[in-house]
């Protein structure tokens, strides 16, 4: 029994017997467990890696290279992109060297011409058989000619009045009339043609500055020369209320003094009036000729 207040002191366990030895061979001491007793923990070992020459070279290369962004900018600046240069600095390329361009242009133009000719021939062939028969007999008058009743008329020389009292006119002889009409591309009108055309001119001459074609005109009648004297007259007739200007009407009544005077010697002078048949257009002429050629070919077969 222990009296109250007495303390009991426990003796520490006996220390284990330890020894040290140079195990690693580098001068460091290591704890060796003796007699199966646990030893004190040894300090941590430090592992040291020694870099090779290859690794050192790669590291130096990486450290010497700039960052990726800088390298991207440098690569873009050093790239071989086309740069706009002044015209003087760029050598001009002569594409027409040795006539290559000229031959190419000539080939293209020749092809276009051949294509146009083939298209024109095709259209002419279609027109040669598609145009009705009535068109072949008609046509148009040239500029300066007036078409009336299927005939082209042209006054070669208008007869000027020699005397206002008698209304006689003088222009040219019959030979001169023939010469004028031949130069204009026609011939002297017949008496029937002259009357038809003069009536038309009289009806259309209704303006203040125009006058009916009064006068004498050379014509051909029954195979001989003749003169037609044309003298129309106008009368003013009043219809309805005379107080209104709208009720006035001007009518032309032709009083034809047709004196077809056959002159065997064709002497004297008169006005010149030419007549010609209307000619079909040029394209229609080619189509008509092509139609005739093709028709002959079909008949020959």
UniProtKB/Swiss-Prot annotation:
Main subcellular location: virion
InterPro entries on file: CTDL_fold (IPR016187)
Pfam families (alphabetical): UL45
UniProt keyword annotation of Membrane present: yes
Compositional bias annotation for Low complexity: 1-20
Virion surface side: 132-301
Region (Disordered): 1-27
Intravirion side: 1-110
Localization, UniProt: Virion membrane
Lineage: superkingdom: Viruses
Transmembrane intervals: 111-131
Keyword set, alphabetical order: Membrane, Signal-anchor, Transmembrane, Transmembrane helix, Viral envelope protein, Virion
A cellular component term, taken from the record's GO annotations: viral envelope
Membrane topology, from the record: Single-pass type II membrane protein
Family: Belongs to the herpesviridae HHV-1 UL45 family.
Biological role stated in the UniProt entry: Seems to be required for glycoprotein B-induced fusion.
Protein name: Envelope protein UL45
Organism: Psittacid herpesvirus 1 (isolate Amazon parrot/-/97-0001/1997)
Source species taxonomy: Viruses, Duplodnaviria, Heunggongvirae, Peploviricota, Herviviricetes
Encoding gene (name): UL45
